[in-house]
Amino acid sequence: MLFMCHQRVMKKEAEEKLKAEELRRARAAADIPIIWILGGPGCGKGTQCAKIVEKYGFTHLSSGDLLRNEVASGSDKGRQLQAVMASGGLVSNDEVLSLLNDAITRAKGSSKGFLIDGYPRQKNQGIEFEARIAPADLALYFECSEDTMVQRIMARAAASAVKRDDDNEKTIRARLLTFKQNTNAILELYEPKTLTINAERDVDDIFLEVVQAIDCVLKKKQQNAAAQC
């Protein structure tokens, strides 16, 4: 009888420890900022991401890089993704979300924050990201005029050793039109958590505005953590 009672006590203690650990992990995850980095090609968001990583030590995740890395790994999933892309098809949002979720899960224990670069590209992707992974704390939209982006893309293409058939003004403007339509829907839905930044200024001036926004997010996180203690 005493042995069975002891077992019940041990089991209850183990369950309480497990619940405490789950609560600790949930609070830790909630304390890690997630920031969406939005902007058209040539807007300079890559430069700003590098500066954010240098200052804050955040983890920079690009959906494109994750796809390429998975293909390069030679895994079963990588071979499946390669087959889809080689056929000219689009990788499903479920696959992209799965890669993002895996990357966030792997880095969550040591990361100070996450920059999700170039995602979401469509409104439904943002909705699914927040439902399946976590709510974004902030969306930074680096706004650039179409003419400026065209000039930057074409200059970058001219300097590249690899030439692409679609690096012409007509095709670029068509891509930018699609981007603008999709982005407008995202900005409308997530307006309360979005900061639109004029990306046609000096890099350091842009970064000052970025820093103010991120510092505000971090301050709120700290206040929430203190309130839970």
UniProtKB/Swiss-Prot annotation:
Entries under SUPFAM superfamilies matching the protein: P-loop containing nucleoside triphosphate hydrolases
Subcellular location field: Cytoplasm
Tissue expression: High expression levels in the thorax, suggesting a possible function in the gastrointestinal or reproductive systems.
Reactions catalysed according to its record: AMP + ATP = 2 ADP
GO MF term list: adenylate kinase activity; ATP binding; UMP kinase activity; UMP/dUMP kinase activity
Modified residues (Phosphoserine): 62
Record key words, sorted: ATP-binding, Cytoplasm, Kinase, Nucleotide-binding, Phosphoprotein, Transferase
Annotated positions binding ATP: 42-47, 156
Signal peptide: none
Lineage: superkingdom: Eukaryota
GO process annotations (BP): 'de novo' pyrimidine nucleobase biosynthetic process; ATP metabolic process; nucleobase-containing compound metabolic process
Annotated residues for binding of AMP: 63, 68, 118-121, 125, 164, 175
Role of this protein: Catalyzes the reversible transfer of the terminal phosphate group between ATP and AMP. Plays an important role in cellular energy homeostasis and in adenine nucleotide metabolism.
Family according to the record: Belongs to the adenylate kinase family. AK1 subfamily.
Protein name stated in the entry: Adenylate kinase 1
Source organism: Drosophila melanogaster
